[in-house]
Curated annotation (Swiss-Prot):
Record bears the keyword Zinc-finger: no
UniProt-listed Enzyme Commission number(s): 1.1.1.267
Pathway: Isoprenoid biosynthesis; isopentenyl diphosphate biosynthesis via DXP pathway; isopentenyl diphosphate from 1-deoxy-D-xylulose 5-phosphate: step 1/6
Gene: dxr
Matching Gene3D superfamilies: 1.10.1740.10, NAD(P)-binding Rossmann-like Domain
Lineage, highest ranks first: Bacteria, Pseudomonadati, Bacteroidota, Bacteroidia, Bacteroidales
Binding site for Mn(2+): 149, 151, 219
Enzyme kind, highest EC tier: oxidoreductase
UniProt binding sites for 1-deoxy-D-xylulose 5-phosphate: 124, 150-151, 174, 197, 210, 215-216, 219
Organism the protein comes from: Porphyromonas gingivalis (strain ATCC BAA-308 / W83)
Protein name: 1-deoxy-D-xylulose 5-phosphate reductoisomerase
Catalytic reaction list: 2-C-methyl-D-erythritol 4-phosphate + NADP(+) = 1-deoxy-D-xylulose 5-phosphate + NADPH + H(+)
PANTHER family, per the entry: 1-DEOXY-D-XYLULOSE 5-PHOSPHATE REDUCTOISOMERASE, 1-DEOXY-D-XYLULOSE 5-PHOSPHATE REDUCTOISOMERASE, CHLOROPLASTIC
HAMAP family, A to Z: DXP_reductoisom
Cofactor: Mg(2+); Mn(2+)
GO biological process, one term: isopentenyl diphosphate biosynthetic process, methylerythritol 4-phosphate pathway involved in terpenoid biosynthetic process
Length: 385
């Protein structure tokens, strides 16, 4: 029986690759809902090809453009962030792929869980901001959360069939495009250089986070919530080849790893198939092509990783604040307003001013996000070039 899929963020990197898989497997999937933030032209093309029941454009100023373009089709056209959260509750949706960027994915994910939709989670910030709340909601509503990030998909696969809790998670990181740059060189690293990831094809925001290792810090927090691990039980290993996507170590010293080419369509496909492996003709790993190497991350050159560990150890609303500050920092860097290393300096100053609340609730997270963004914006002028 075919599954009806909702894709939140269908015009982004994960969204377009999800549609690639659906296109090749029309006997398995139908597209029910597509959403985008601003990319009207691509959303229109996607809607005309996949004929969803509903499309939503978050930017309400572009509503009339898509409404006119799809007027000849029986597709409901909605607009606004609240409309995305409403659309995911449609009774006929089976699975929601949460591929929106950043904090914006939080409320739609909550609404989808409350509506008891299966979640294919590509929006790691949802668990960074509100991991305890999300996992409790998922448990209360008996909703499976299937990880789309390659690392968490690898851990999920390595844990299948295991009856005992793992001793440690070994979370691998490519190291990004700046792995071997000196501290001096990092100060002059450009946006264009940061966006040239050596292994992965990803969106701009996550690519910058990968370059700063903030992405790995957020993935550590995501792993903590998904797999019920403590931060000290998660080790980060730099693995430049991105062939081993992560590993799990058990109390007898055994280690299980999941390997594959660095292609996001693999973990997306695994999540869509709900652990059923969908055949494909993608390239296979050539184990003779290159050695597999590992090294420890340099926390002096890449302090964002330390900030993530600090935030999750503090708990409460600290990870939410870190995420908000990081979104402001990355946006400023992408606009060439601050330097690469100033992103970390901005995060440090924001977190020094952060007011910690232990309460875990949606109103707390909403207030923390808003307040932290305001603080980060107020500090930006001292870093602007």
């Amino acid at each position: 029986m075919k599954k009806n899929i909702a894709i939140l963020g269908s015009t982004g990197s994960i969204g377009t690759q999800t549609l690639d898989i659906i296109h090749l497997n029309p006997d398995l999937f139908d597209v029910y809902l597509l959403t985008a933030n601003n990319n009207v032209d691509l959303l229109i093309r996607q809607a005309r090809e996949y004929r969803p029941e509903i499309v939503v454009i978050a930017n309400d100023q572009k509503y009339h453009l898509i409404q006119e373009a799809l007027a000849d089709l029986p597709i409901k056209v909605w607009c606004g962030a609240e409309a995305i959260a409403d659309a995911v509750t449609a009774p006929d949706i089976d699975m929601v792929v949460t591929a929106m960027v950043g904090y914006s994915g939080l409320l739609p994910t909550i609404k989808a869980i409350e509506a008891r939709k299966m979640i294919a989670l590509a929006n790691k910030e949802t668990l960074v901001v509100a991991g305890e709340l999300i996992m409790r909601l998922a448990q209360d509503n008996q909703v499976p959360i299937l990880p789309v990030d390659s690392e968490h998909s690898a851990i999920f696969q390595a844990l299948l069939g295991e009856r005992q809790r793992p001793e440690k998670i070994l979370l691998t990181a490519s190291g990004g495009p700046f792995l071997h740059l000196t501290a001096e060189e990092l100060q002059h690293a450009t946006r264009e250089q940061a966006l040239r990831h050596p292994n992965w094809n990803m969106g701009a925001k996550v690519t910058i986070d990968s370059a700063s290792l903030m992405n790995k810090g957020f993935e550590m927090i995501e792993a903590k919530w998904l797999f019920e691990m403590q931060p000290d039980e998660i080790e980060i290993l730099v693995h430049p080849q991105s062939i081993i996507h992560s590993m799990v170590q058990f109390r007898d010293g055994s280690v299980k790893a999941q390997l594959g080419i660095p292609d996001m369509r693999l973990p997306i496909s695994y999540a869509l198939g709900i652990t059923h492996r969908i055949p494909n003709d993608y390239p296979r790993v050539d184990f003779t092509a290159t050695p597999l190497t590992f090294e420890r991350p340099d926390l002096e050159r890449f302090p964002n990783l330390s900030y993530a560990f600090d935030a999750i150890r503090l708990g409460g609303n600290a990870p939410c604040a870190l995420n908000a500050a990081n979104e402001i920092a990355v946006t400023a860097f992408l606009r060439d307003e601050i330097s690469f290393t100033d992103m970390s300096r901005l995060l440090y100053e924001v977190m020094e001013k952060h007011e910690l609340f232990r309460e875990v609730s949606l109103p707390t997270f909403i207030e923390t996000d808003s307040n932290t963004r305001r603080v980060a914006e107020s500090l930006l002028p001292k870093f602007r070039r």
